[in-house]
Amino acid sequence: MDFFRIVENQQPPATMPLNVSFTNRNYDLDYDSVQPYFYCDEEENFYQQQQQSELQPPAPSEDIWKKFELLPTPPLSPSRRSGLCSPSYVAVTPFSLRGDNDGGGGSFSTADQLEMVTELLGGDMVNQSFICDPDDETFIKNIIIQDCMWSGFSAAAKLVSEKLASYQAARKDSGSPNPARGHSVCSTSSLYLQDLSAAASECIDPSVVFPYPLNDSSSPKSCPSQDSSAFSPSSDSLLSSTESSPQGSPEPLVLHEETPPTTSSDSEEEQEDEEEIDVVSVEKRQAPGKRSESGSPSAGGHSKPPHSPLVLKRCHVSTHQHNYAAPPSTRKDYPAAKRVKLDSVRVLRQISNNRKCTSPRSSDTEENDKRRTHNVLERQRRNELKRSFFALRDQIPELENNEKAPKVVILKKATAYILSVQAEEQKLISEEDLLRKRREQLKHKLEQLRNSCA
């Protein structure tokens, strides 16, 4: 990045017109990168963005840290370009003050003021001045380093506003367009840069405050390694995370093992989802509040032990916060998946109970059916047996007309009758044989008689 160079003309002509000239560059992009750091009006509401995202005003304890007058944290990384890291490189470029058309004034226009302050705040010199020399151990033992709540957002805003006010007052005091005016303005600019350098020299090395370097928090899918020794010290990640933020303000650096940092818009969407969705567990209801609290912009930061996530966040607390003072809820809520699972288990239990209840009924019906079938078959068999007895009774001459004859009598009489019948049969058979023999004899005798007659 080019620098805004200021050179004092040693002997300018008395009739030299005052004008302002800058190097050819795209100032719009540079101004957009540092626009949140510039406040034209000292009475501007610095917390308008927080109020729009439904955040609380700064806590009363925040004013305690204004006495330290620290610059915005986290500090910006030094430039990697060769020859740009030393403040001695800050040269000044010739520029002349342009007089007004009315001839009486000589003050800068609003555009010139914006460009000048943009150059002063966006230069590599200022970015480099945010980091002190790592070899300098003067401020390492400072008590501020050991305080986990050290902050500089409000102090930096007050410092910038005071410097701009003094800078504008110094330009307004010099009323006549003469060489002394240009000399005073240039000296004021030099003093402003010196003040920034002096204030920046009181900063500390970020490697001392952050023993575990952080990855780039601006990337949406940051997945840092779980091993802290795997991180390599990189100050460019801090610089890129500060400059690549959409609003230019220092974003909270979150080192988390599972979830990436959330912005205020994400927290608002999660809060809306929390209001719309009811079928969630208590832990899931608390999670969006915690994530929105960690992602909400605040003015202070704090560090945690190495085993816990290292979070830098400002001290504005979201209104949508879990009330830990409230009594614990007695109602037990289950997630949707767990409810479905419980319902399915309940249905399976009911089905099993129904099966257990219906199995005796089915067995009884089967037994009844079998018994009924057996009874039918047995009745048929008895009926057939009865008819057989009746038929047998009808065949016995002694029991032919006795309808009340018992079965035993029928069987006995039937047996006696059969034996008698069989005996008679044998007798008849023997008689038949005798008769046949007699017939044969008679036939033979008849044949003999016919032969004798012939």
Curated annotation (Swiss-Prot):
The principal location of this protein is nucleus
**Which residue stretches does the UniProt record annotate as biased composition, category Low complexity?**
216-252
Extent of Basic and acidic residues compositional bias? 281-293
Positions of the bHLH domain: 369-421
Name the residue ranges of motif: UBR5-degron.
370-379
Motif stretch (9aaTAD): 115-123
Q: Which residues carry this modification: Phosphothreonine?
A: 23, 73, 330
Highest taxon of source: Eukaryota
Residues forming coiled coils: none
Residue numbers spanned by region Leucine-zipper: 428-449
Query: What is one process in the GO biological process aspect for this record?
Result: positive regulation of transcription by RNA polymerase II
* SUPFAM superfamilies (UniProt xref): HLH, helix-loop-helix DNA-binding domain
Q: Where is the composition biased (Polar residues)?
A: 350-362
For the modification Phosphoserine, which residues carry it? 21, 77, 86, 96, 166, 174, 176, 308, 329, 344, 359, 362-363
Compartments where located: Nucleus, Nucleoplasm; Nucleus, Nucleolus; Nucleus; Cytoplasm
**Additional record remark:** Alternative translation initiation from an upstream, in-frame non-ATG (CTG) codon or a downstream ATG start site results in the production of 2 isoforms with distinct N-termini, shown in this entry as isoform 2 and isoform 1, respectively.
Q: What function is annotated for this protein? A: Transcription factor that binds DNA in a non-specific manner, yet also specifically recognizes the core sequence 5'-CAC[GA]TG-3'. Activates the transcription of growth-related genes. Binds to the VEGFA promoter, promoting VEGFA production and subsequent sprouting angiogenesis. Regulator of somatic reprogramming, controls self-renewal of embryonic stem cells. Functions with TAF6L to activate target gene expression through RNA polymerase II pause release.
Q: What is this protein called?
A: Myc proto-oncogene protein
The species is Pan troglodytes (Chimpanzee)
